[in-house]
Amino acid sequence: MEHTASLPGYVREKLAELDLELSEGDITQKGYEKKRAKLLQPFLKKPEGDKVKSTPPPPYYNVKNANNSTNHGNINNDGVIVSSEGYSYVTEVPSLSSSQQRHSKKIDFHQQAAMSLSSAPQSGNAGAPGYENMRPQGGAVGDPGYQNTREPSAFQNQQSTNNSQHRQRRTQRKVTHNEKRYHSEVRQEAVQQALAALKGRPKPSLPMPSKRTSVLNRSPGCNDELDSSTDDESIPEETISPDKEYNYPRDHISNSILPPEPIIKPPIRESSMGSQQHARTDVKQNQITNQKYTAPNSAPERRPPQNLPPLPTSEPLSSDYPPIAYKRENDFSDKAFKQKQYNAPDITQFNNAHRAADRVTRYVNVSQNELNETDANGKWKVSAKIQQLLNTLKRPKRRPLPEFYEDNDIELEIAANTKDPNAPKPEGSTMTPVQGEQLSIPAGLPRTLECALQRYGTNSFKSPMATVLDPNGKVTTTLTYGKLLSRAQKIAHALSTKIFSKGPEQVTLKPGDRVALVYPNNDPLSFITAWYGCMFRGLVPLPIELPLSSSDTPPQQVGFLLSSCGITVALTSEACLKGLPKSTTTGEIAKLKGWPRLQWFVTEHLPKPPKEFNVGNLRADDSAAAYIEYTTDKEGSVMGVTVTRAAMINHCRALTMACHYTEGETIVCVLDFKREVGLWHSVLTSVLNGMHVIFIPYALMKLRPSSWMQLITKHRASCCLVKSRDLHWGLLATKDHKDISLSSLRMLLVADGANPWSLSSCDQFLSVFQAKGLRSDAICPCASSSEVFTVSLRRPGRGSCGFSPSATGRGVLSMAALSHGVVRVDSEDSLTSLTLQDCGQVMPAAQMVVVRSEGPPVLCKTDQVGEICVTSGSTSASYFGLDGMTNSTFKVQPLLEELEQPKDGNGTVNIISKPIGEDFYVRSGLLGFLGPGGLVFVCGSRDGLMTVTGRKHNADDIIATVLAVEPMRFIYRGRIAVFSIKVLRDERVCVIAEQRPDCSEEESFQWMSRVLQAVDSIHQVGIYCLALVPPNHLPKTPLGGIHLCEARRRFLEGSLHPANVLMCPHTCVTNLPKPRELHQGVQTAAKLSSSSGCGITDTGVGPASVMVGNLVQGNRLAEAHGRDVGLAEDCERKPQLITGVLRWRANTSPDHIIFTLLNSKGAIAKTLTCSELHKRAEKIAALLQERGRIEPGDHVALIFPPGLDLLCAFYGCLYLGAIPITIRPPHPQNLNTTLPTVRMIVDVSKSGIVLSIQPIIKLLKSREAATSIDPKTWPPILDIDDNPKRKYAGIATVSFDSSAYLDFSVSTCGRLSGVNITHRSLSSLCASLKLACELYPSRHVALCLDPYCGLGFVMWTLIGVYSGHHSILIAPYEVEANPSLWLSTLSQHRVRDTFCSYGVIELCTKALSNSIPSLKQRNIDLRCVRTCVVVAEERPRVQLTQQFCKLFQALGLNTRCVSTSFGCRVNPAICVQGASSAESAQVYVDMRALRNNRVALVERGAPNSLCVIESGKLLPGVKVIIANPETKGHCGDSHLGEIWVQAPHNANGYFTIYGDETDYNDHFNAKLVTGATSELYARTGYLGFLRRTECSQSASLLDETTPSVASRDSDTESLNSISQLQLNFSNVSLGGNSEHSLVGGASNANDQELHDAVYVVGAVDEVISLRGMNYHPIDIENSVMRCHKKIAECAVFTWTNLLVVVVELDGNESEALDLVPLVTNTVLEDHQLIVGVVVVVDPGVVPINSRGEKQRMHLRDGFLADQLDPIYVAYNM
């Protein structure tokens, strides 16, 4: 063992932290040894010769100068010109080169599903061993264990051959029609190396997602228009964002590196100026340091690696691919130089940096208010009343209301945005604003656009203004300036005279009114004429996209914009009007969803205006709005950007100067002419300069990608407006290249030059077409946004600008540094580099700054990435109608941070921020930095930025990596969307792509696995969700690109319909709350406890200590009583045995109708009087005695449907003294499942005979039943309709303590248990119910529930006979046939009291939600209902109950009357809402506290709040306490524990328990270990708490404005705390009975005001324990049910420590995979749990018992036995 005394202090600190983590079980032994070795490695003996040299980061750009290179400096040895400014200028034209071939290794997968899944990390702190070994070895930014270095021999070998082969390779390049050439070759090589580095490492075995055969057979391509078969035949569509459209990967990522070796010795800083060998080492070390700075030192802050899901083991997968030659760019110098303005940061020395503690308390306990204590001696020297007053005054006040709504999950936010202390910091000087050249307006340029059109329309009326091509490439129409002027005047005149009807009003359009322009993308001529018609009239046009259908979602957002702008008139063409969606009834234009009602005005075939009409009379103010352009933000919201007339004309002038436009020039436009660059150049600036524009529709570009180049050749065009997509498409059309000449082209404007991947498109296009006359200075990338217009533009010709005209720049940047917002140069052969080109210079008359993208707009440093802001006279003015967003975007004053020295020299130094000037800047939404000479570098956009775990990633970078993964043609080229979603306080990366139609499931899984590895290795970020959709399933923009916002919306909504989904929450989610640690006391107690407890408290503190603590603090002990059972008036005349009661009623009131059975139509099927029941019971007793040879005490199985036969058979058994067992008959359609349960109950109950009716007897002996149960093995079966030969002699005499019947039931955990109910318990229960519910013979009670067990059996069979009331029986299956049967019965018979089940409530709510009007027409009135009790053995379903009340409130239902009962196996009726009981009280508890077995009361609507409703009122004679299920100690008031019950009608014990070998003897004879230790209780097996609360609530459950109970009563104790305290002490000291306690007893003086409410939380056996916390399945299931409308039912359970969620899909199988991400997101967000498996099944698969409870364990068994026939099973990684 090493001696650690000589180690530095911080190392010893970290070793101590590791020892603590190991002792607490946070990490494994293997992880401990690995981290410990890593800490001690720098201090072990080091081999010599391994010193690694370090260099400061060199400057971040290389600028090339083709014309005046010798004026800037001297040429160094590498041919790079070193300038006096420290920048390097490359003197040769960039070119492409190939690199070494790489080979892949074979990947083996092993399917060990349960083992690997169980090892998936549930904690955010450390990964399990199965996942720990998946860390990528190359380029592991953020992981200190995997530093990125090169093997020295490989490094030198490559560098020595690089220069000699460079020019030879460049000359050997061929331009062929090989599509691979235009993929991201350098990125592809980086991906291949990253994957190769991972292939030899062990993989966790994870099963591949499984699909049902029908889903597999379904073709992924569902659309008829399958227009993307190949990339050559059908060109991939445009972009991902409607604003910033893109289509293919950037080819700008530099070369990869060889497999790394670990760093042995800490690097030492040295100067970077030295020999060439030193320079090579510097490049290498720079790469190392750029990857080391983000490395944290311990597991909690390290993101677990992205893991590879294995494939099924049917056959091993081979990934040996043929070698592919890769090409890489070699445009950059191998050397980089220090920048003079600042010293480079020492980012290699981070070992001495002390880190904050790894353990962050991620959960803040919500403490209860506690009483202040007084002196122990003084407490007994004053009277009780005075002491009570003193304690009341000293009691802490309730928490302030705002505190209930504070965000208590801030720890999750902190964990999601960890600050890496070793991250690079910007170290440059603060930037200064960069000024564009002075705007010089050419002589003779028209003053306004209207003047320009009038001039050219008059003087050059035959000159062509616009030409459009048809889909065949032929010129169809040419619009001259004369025609444009005359048509615009016609439109202006028509708009000034047209009267539009707006409701009853007649309105005309006035100057300044806003109108919509709706024109298709192939009709620019009509659009231009309408545009200038609006300009002449002074109207404000808003161009919008053509709505494709009335249900399209993007037009909904546009409709909101139209409404906010007050637009009522839309201009369109006749052809467009015919294509608009029509109403099916009237044939008129349909009302589009979300749109205002528009008046459509056709701008064609208008009359000629009169001669006196003069469009020049309108003199609009320059500050007035000229037009509105829509833009979309990251979330998909559409906003209108208002452009003033001054800004419009100033921008046109600036473009005229920057682009050198002159009159008569010809421009070819491939862009969208309705917005942004296409609008500014082809519609506005072209008219200002009198130019000719040729428009190429998108449909033609898809068919003939080279058509724009052919038009340039044919018309000798001088300018062309394209996107990098069009360059790429033109390169693919090699067969058309021979006739192309681009010598006339002086400007090729690349509109999306701000996309970093445009660099490769420009370089490749230039290299191919330079031989066709294309000049290198003609390619002009530009950056733009709707808010700023043109941000920057590279000038054409580069010769006549004001300053540094010839400079163009590009540089290789570290993506890892960019993720921290810092610019650092990376080596060319780095896996994680990004190559950028400049987007030109600042526009004329504009001034530009870069400010921080987050927080206040502080000026950035020169080496810091921020948001580009511009001030000029040519920017937008505002977002229409959005003042708040306008101020934050269009009125930005950049701040300059300065240090304020204290006046006395001794104080602290403060940082103050001052505005740099009076000017307001406009945010462009582009992220970048400024280079020398005003060069603008853009590396992303604000909308495309994803901040994951504190680091920023560009969606474009992720796309480039994904598209470089083999096989290259797996997904369609431009059909990919990358975005982030906010889940659990952090952004998660989602990748959606369209797959090829012919790929198999296994191929998809392989490709997705490689993508996960590649993105994790290169970007150091995990993909949260990777989904593949069928071809043409991603939403498109009007120009065919990906509509990113709509794709994101559909993904979150669950309407994207993917074909394959892979979720990786285990590796991506690192900010889960810290697992709860169970201390040794809890673990020991859990082992010793005989019951299946849930670890309620830390038993290191004994139960006696807990009780004394409660007493000392004055807290009540949780104990409650029902009222005493009084003597009824006719008690002396009525015997107490139920058989005697029936015989007595038959004698005293023989004709009294006691039971009425209704059929499905509501008609009376049968009635039963007291005498009829008595006689039939005697007959059946005689039958059993005669034919069945039944003796008193024998067991008889009764298998009957709900009805009167069951009643008669039950009393027949009691008459004979036999013990009946009621059993639900098997379902005819589901015999295989239900018949074995029936037979099991018959066998377990030891029934000697079966009594039933003829249809069920035939079913038991049928051929279908014989496949499950042999008919010959049944006990003797008797038909109840058989007639005995002689009458029964007399009723058997039985004792009160003998068994009356056995109550069998299957629990939700799959346990079959039968309890013994004695005659004494039966009579006591009936007496208690009669007293609570005020039942007597004249009452009518409607029952709609299952009569086989629990309180349902008691209400159906016993209480009617005991109380003599009229019971109206409705079988639940009759309600399924007629959902309104139950409610109509209540109304028809004026029933005041009714009992039902949750199944009936749910059926009525779902089936009758749309039938309220028809029910009103049938005069159904529910005002008569006084109590509606839902019989249940679970926590009350608050949401379902509230929905039922709210729905039928329209029929007069009083919402207060609906309540829930509570019973269990040990006592069928503990709580029932009585006839005169107050309304059930509700409280809101904190779900997070509940997970930790605590009750913390909060307010309605508070974060993590859960509404819990009181389960009825305690029945008379019932006493309830709350005890700790582990320690059996008495809990305090409002503390969570197990509900124990003491009542005369408790069951007498279990007859038998089948399916569980646990000892349950103490369930009926439990004793407390503290307090009244001699009393016996029955353990219910349910967790809950007691709370003293008010007896009535003034508001119903639905009243959202009334405070909850928590706001109106004490948080800690009752009003009688002191007297209760004394009484408790006396009870403890005497060890006696505390039945006479004032706590909730009938003797309490405040009994009319206060009562003890029983709140049931859930069954102990159902508690799911994950991460040390306890979850109740119903809470998780409620969250899942809310996440998607197609989820019909849901159930959760655990499997190998993984959470499994089973959801029933009520929809098409194609929608199954929509549920997987939503279920995962919802459970993660609401419960901080990671779902391990999502199973999508058909409706009806989740088993539900007769009480409406889910049989989760049966479902689990079916899942493990593969019996569910799932539609889809997703295994989350």
Curated annotation (Swiss-Prot):
The keyword Phosphoprotein applies. Expressed in the developing nervous system. Ubiquitously expressed in the developing brain. Within the mushroom body, a higher level is detected in the core of lobes and peduncle in the late third instar larva. Detected in whole mushroom body neuron structures at 48 hours after puparium formation and during later stages. Residues 176-185, 241-253 have a biased composition (Basic and acidic residues). This is Disco-interacting protein 2. Residues 224-236 have a biased composition (Acidic residues). Its main location: membrane. The gene is DIP2. GO terms for molecular function: acetate-CoA ligase activity. It comes from Drosophila melanogaster.
